[in-house]
Curated annotation (Swiss-Prot):
Top-rank EC class of the record's enzyme: transferase
Keyword check for Acyltransferase: yes
Pfam annotation, one family: Transferase
Subunit structure: Monomer.
Disulphide-bonded residues: none
Protein name, entry field: Eremophilane O-acetyltransferase ORF8
The EC number(s) this enzyme carries: 2.3.1.-
Gene disruption: observed consequences: Impairs the production of PR-toxin as well as of the intermediate eremofortin A, but accumulates eremofortin B.
Acyltransferase in keyword set: yes
Associated pathway: Sesquiterpene biosynthesis
Entry's family note: Belongs to the fumigaclavine B O-acetyltransferase family.
Function: O-acetyltransferase; part of the gene cluster that mediates the biosynthesis of PR-toxin, a bicyclic sesquiterpene belonging to the eremophilane class and acting as a mycotoxin. The first step of the pathway is catalyzed by the aristolochene synthase which performs the cyclization of trans,trans-farnesyl diphosphate (FPP) to the bicyclic sesquiterpene aristolochene. Following the formation of aristolochene, the non-oxygenated aristolochene is converted to the trioxygenated intermediate eremofortin B, via 7-epi-neopetasone.
Gene3D superfamilies (alphabetical): Chloramphenicol acetyltransferase-like domain
Organism: Penicillium roqueforti (strain FM164)
């Protein structure tokens, strides 16, 4: 079973993240005859989960007058208790904008460009009429069910969201007995709901901002602006409209077989004696190369300005590195930057192993407990959460790769619903990111969101499509 921490308080890392919602979709075949019983199962189970962990019914508030620091986050939990209600959305009626059957979507591999967040999600990515920490919407289509889970990113990272969904499945599966269940021991958060390593108030007694602010690596690992070139800021708080991307982006999904991944790893073996890269390092290097070629075609021939740099940013879960309990659902996310000249990344003459070993070296260097504690120290001592800016330009010379390979969605049992058939994110959910999905039947899928011209160029790249199948 997937236990959750008993209490929840916002951490230094939570406060560094932009205030927006993101959505996960879990897809199941469900006949129309079972809709009523399925709806009852879902609501009963979510109510049971909310009763078990009332902080899941809470809302996020930013305190601009806090004695801790300006913009300190507060979690308001309703008292008396308020239930967490599912939004049930019937998309099978004759007047519905939704036309696809579940079988139609299944036959085409459940492509994300057909999964419109405006129809399926209780909260569109980045835009909210609420500050709830999470919301759930159950969408019934002909022959199936698409459950949308929306989470506030200040509240939870991908691992934590997966943990909450997994605990929800425990309730659906009937394996949780609230009357006789014991709270998890040793989750490291006690009644304060936060591990000491992440507590803003404790960290401010250990670190000083002026001792840390001159180290660009600490800023990078927080994904905060350090180069002085990026003026983009997220809205101060939701509800707020995000800037419209011009030109707009489109989502595409690609699949890599286990044989394709093995061949990419073989291509990416470094020339240095004794050097080693993982399959993930090799895949990141491969994606970085071909994404930059799609955005900057002249990088193939090293014709970009020689001083133009590119970054690939890999999201790292720091729980193991910081010895934080797996029951902890808050953000424990670090951002590992590898930078190279863009001509080197895109060049036909650059060995893939030279890129992959750089990725491996920066990841290895980042997984240092002393370093990560200082990164959290910078996050805790920053004087104003509202003045921070973010460090990468993901639609330009940078690529952000986040891997959800370890999320348990395909392992979960949902009682009468069985196992999850598809895990997806809605169309354009993470603009400009490259998201690696949990593997299914030995196949790894990833979703990219790119400008349309760049996406077309990627799909026509013969070297890329030799290994990647477009969905």
């Amino acid at each position: 079973m997937y236990e959750l921490q008993q209490h929840r308080k916002f951490s230094a890392l939570d406060e560094m993240l932009p205030a927006f919602y993101y959505c996960y979709l879990l897809c199941f075949p469900v006949s129309s005859d079972n809709r009523a019983s399925t709806s009852e199962l879902l609501q009963t189970s979510l109510s049971s989960l909310a009763e078990e962990r009332p902080y899941l019914t809470g809302t996020v508030r930013r305190d601009m007058e806090s004695s801790v620091r300006k913009g300190h986050l507060i979690l308001d939990i309703p008292n008396p208790f308020e239930d967490l209600r599912i939004v049930f959305n019937d998309l099978t009626g004759p007047k519905s904008q939704w036309k696809e059957t579940y079988q139609d979507l299944k036959d085409t591999g459940m492509p994300p460009h057909k999964l419109d967040a405006n129809l399926l999600a209780p909260l569109t990515a980045g835009i909210g009429e609420t500050r709830k920490v999470m919301s759930v919407q159950a969408n019934f289509i002909h022959g199936g069910l698409l459950i949308a889970f929306c989470f506030h990113h200040n509240f939870v990272d991908a691992y934590g969201a997966g943990r909450i969904i997994a605990r929800f499945s425990d309730h659906c599966n009937g394996t949780v007995d609230l009357k006789n269940s014991a709270d998890p021991e040793g989750d490291g958060t006690d009644s304060r709901g936060i591990a000491d390593l992440l507590d803003v108030e404790l960290l401010k007694k250990q670190y000083k901002f002026e001792d840390l602010e001159s180290d660009p690596n600490l800023w990078r690992l927080n994904c905060l602006e350090f180069r002085g070139v990026n003026d983009f800021r997220w809205p101060d708080f939701i509800p707020a409209l995000l800037p419209v991307r011009k030109p707009p982006v489109i989502s595409s999904m690609f699949s890599f077989s286990s044989d394709a991944l093995a061949e990419i790893k073989a291509m990416a073996q470094p020339n240095q004696s004794g050097a080693w890269v993982s399959t993930n390092d090799a895949l990141v290097a491969f994606l970085w190369r071909h994404t930059m070629r799609a955005r900057f075609p002249s990088s193939r021939t090293e014709s970009e300005p020689p001083n133009r740099k590119s970054n690939v940013v890999v999201a790292l879960d720091g729980r193991k590195d910081l010895s934080i309990s797996p029951t902890y659902i808050g953000n424990c996310l670090f951002h590992c930057f590898t930078d190279l000249p863009i001509n080197m990344v895109g060049s036909e003459s650059t060995h893939l192993g030279d890129i992959a070993i750089k990725v491996r070296q920066t990841i290895t260097a980042a997984r240092n407990k002393t370093l990560l504690k200082a990164v959290v120290g910078l996050a805790a001592t920053h004087p104003d959460c509202q003045t921070i800016k973010y460090a990468n330009d993901n639609l330009g010379p940078d690529l952000y790769v986040t891997s959800w390979i370890d999320l348990p969605f395909y392992k979960l049992e949902w009682g009468p619903l069985g196992k999850t058939e598809f895990f997806r994110i809605p169309d354009r959910q993470f603009e400009s990111l490259c998201c690696i999905l949990p593997p299914k039947d030995g196949v790894v899928q990833l979703i990219t969101s790119m400008e349309e011209d760049h996406s077309k160029r990627l799909r026509s790249d013969a070297e890329f499509t030799r290994f990647a199948t477009y969905r």
